[in-house]
Amino acid sequence: MGAKKNLLAELREKSSEELDEFIRDNKKALFALRAEAALQNKVVKTHQFSLYKKSIARALIIKQEKKDRVHG
């Protein structure tokens, strides 16, 4: 639980551009992991799929919260 709270605190401190970069980097890493799993007969740590997806979702939620605060 501590790591998740630290990640949320770090994400809340980031600007919108930094959040976009974080989301982009995580999407690239998720794509690379999927490609590695599909194209190579290599063992992939499957729990990483959900970790990347959850990190992306958290960043998108925080980005939306910031947008609502500005326009709300």
Curated annotation (Swiss-Prot):
<dbReference type="GO" id="GO:0022625">
    <property type="term" value="C:cytosolic large ribosomal subunit"/>
</dbReference>
<comment type="similarity">
    <text>Belongs to the universal ribosomal protein uL29 family.</text>
</comment>
<keyword id="KW-0689">Ribosomal protein</keyword>
<dbReference type="GO" id="GO:0006412">
    <property type="term" value="P:translation"/>
</dbReference>
<dbReference type="InterPro" id="IPR036049">
    <property type="entry name" value="Ribosomal_uL29_sf"/>
</dbReference>
<dbReference type="Pfam" id="PF00831">
    <property type="entry name" value="Ribosomal_L29"/>
</dbReference>
<protein>
    <recommendedName>
        <fullName>Large ribosomal subunit protein uL29</fullName>
    </recommendedName>
</protein>
<keyword id="KW-0687">Ribonucleoprotein</keyword>
<dbReference type="InterPro" id="IPR001854">
    <property type="entry name" value="Ribosomal_uL29"/>
</dbReference>
<dbReference type="InterPro" id="IPR018254">
    <property type="entry name" value="Ribosomal_uL29_CS"/>
</dbReference>
<dbReference type="InterPro" id="IPR050063">
    <property type="entry name" value="Ribosomal_protein_uL29"/>
</dbReference>
<dbReference type="GO" id="GO:0003735">
    <property type="term" value="F:structural constituent of ribosome"/>
</dbReference>
